[in-house]
């Protein structure tokens, strides 16, 4: 029996990983341009961390977590989201002691859900968190940052929804109102909603059951219960977004699926990916650090689904630079192969960022040249017994009608660098300089492969 991937956990093959890498690189560069630093946290955490942070009466904790006992009979969970782990790391290492933090992380998350387009049991997220900031200015920055990503990636068909969940006192009053409302229609509630009515009625608003939507639509609205400070916070956030030219709509039913949120919550969604349209979502969680044992620390963050982001990038016609080599070395014979290894490393030293593929596994000149053409390389570097004896190499353009040139090895790096640069300047290069940046060139050629 052949091994197969677990349902809902997908391989990202080479033809797709280039798109992932391109999208992730742009997202990372935007995040770091706002002063956020990367943190890496474990995939496995103690189960209690998620029960305390996400909330016992949530779909994630009740139905979706991958939880098991390790060899010490300790309950551990494969992280369903990253915020709790980042907060735990901050508490463990004293990152919140009289200091503010701007952090981001990325990696796989795990939830036992029904697999469908845009929803998987192993999925990838990029998370950005700002700890120690209480004002609406950082809320605005995080939302504006995400909008900058859409612009850099050339994405469209995204809409932003906002809401405020207010303070703990706001939620207490609103909870009483919800209990009164849903208790009056209890006979119409589904089983999950009846249970949530007793434990956490706000979770009813997050129900995906179509039969519940009409009841939810008529429920009281959180915004009508906001305390003055929360209302002012929300109003100032909207002023900042208006000033930045960010379009949004206020959705009073937006509550998010995690219990730790308060005040600002938001979601970027698209209609381009079917029912799983949320691309990026988050909110403020001012009480979570203290709840998990740290000092009182205001905080806000968002999470972005990479699979959905890549899917939207493709739906919007996004193009990824070709990742093929610049040069394919055709080496016929053992002496030529030895020389090919020598030349390839010398060229990598001379031209920073150059991509070279050396033919391995032998083959005739004709078969190797076919491989060179199939690789997408701009040039074939031809080596045979004659070239080895004369300390020269054949430089054959593969994307133009130019003739093959014989180049002395001592001049090869300069000649090749010049040709690659001319191809870029003339638009013949299969990668554009602004899409494939590398570091400065070696002094030998004064050229950096872009």
Kindly give the residue locations of the regions a language model identified.
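TRNA-recognition modules of translation machinery and tRNA-sensing kinases, especially anticodon-binding
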Residues: 1-450
């Amino acid at each position: 029996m052949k091994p197969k991937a677990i349902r809902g956990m997908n391989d990202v093959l080479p033809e797709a990983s280039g798109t992932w890498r391109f999208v992730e690189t742009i997202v990372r560069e935007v995040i770091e341009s706002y002063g956020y630093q990367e943190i890496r946290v474990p995939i496995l955490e103690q189960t209690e961390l998620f029960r305390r942070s996400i909330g016992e009466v949530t779909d994630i904790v009740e139905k979706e977590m991958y939880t098991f006992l390790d060899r010490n009979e300790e309950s551990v969970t494969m992280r369903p989201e990253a915020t709790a782990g980042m907060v735990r790391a901050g508490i463990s290492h004293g990152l919140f002691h009289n200091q503010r933090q701007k952090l981001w992380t990325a990696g796989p998350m795990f939830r036992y859900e029904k697999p469908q387009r845009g929803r998987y049991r192993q999925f990838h997220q990029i998370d950005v968190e700002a700890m120690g900031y209480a004002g609406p200015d950082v809320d605005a920055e995080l939302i504006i940052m995400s909008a900058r990503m859409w612009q850099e990636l050339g994405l469209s068909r995204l809409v932003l929804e906002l809401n405020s969940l207010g303070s703990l006192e706001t939620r207490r009053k609103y909870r009483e109102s919800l209990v009164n409302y849903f208790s009056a229609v209890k006979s119409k509630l589904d089983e999950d909603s009846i249970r949530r009515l007793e434990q956490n009625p706000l979770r009813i608003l997050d129900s995906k059951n179509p039969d519940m939507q009409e009841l939810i639509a008529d429920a009281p609205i959180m915004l009508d219960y906001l305390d003055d400070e929360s209302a002012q916070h929300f109003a100032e956030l909207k002023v900042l977004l208006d000033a930045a030219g960010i379009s949004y709509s206020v959705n009073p039913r937006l509550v998010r699926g995690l219990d730790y949120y308060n005040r600002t919550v938001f979601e970027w969604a698209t209609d381009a990916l079917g029912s799983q349209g949320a691309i990026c979502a988050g909110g403020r969680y001012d009480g979570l650090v203290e709840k998990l044992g740290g000092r009182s620390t205001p905080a806000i963050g968002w999470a972005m689904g990479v699979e959905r982001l890549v899917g939207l990038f493709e739906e919007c016609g996004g193009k990824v630079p070709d990742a093929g080599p610049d040069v394919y070395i055709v080496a016929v014979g053992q002496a030529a192969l030895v020389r090919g290894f020598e030349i390839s490393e010398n060229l990598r030293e001379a031209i920073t960022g150059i991509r070279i593929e050396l033919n391995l596994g032998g083959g005739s000149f004709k078969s190797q040249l076919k491989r060179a053409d199939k690789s997408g390389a701009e040039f074939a570097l031809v080596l045979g017994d004659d070239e080895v004896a004369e300390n020269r190499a054949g430089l054959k353009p593969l994307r133009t009608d130019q003739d093959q040139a014989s180049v002395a090895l001592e001049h090869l790096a300069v000649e090749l660098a010049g040709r690659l640069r001319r191809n870029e300047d003339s638009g013949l290069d299969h990668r554009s300089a602004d899409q494939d940046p590398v570091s400065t060139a070696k002094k030998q050629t004064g050229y950096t492969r872009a």
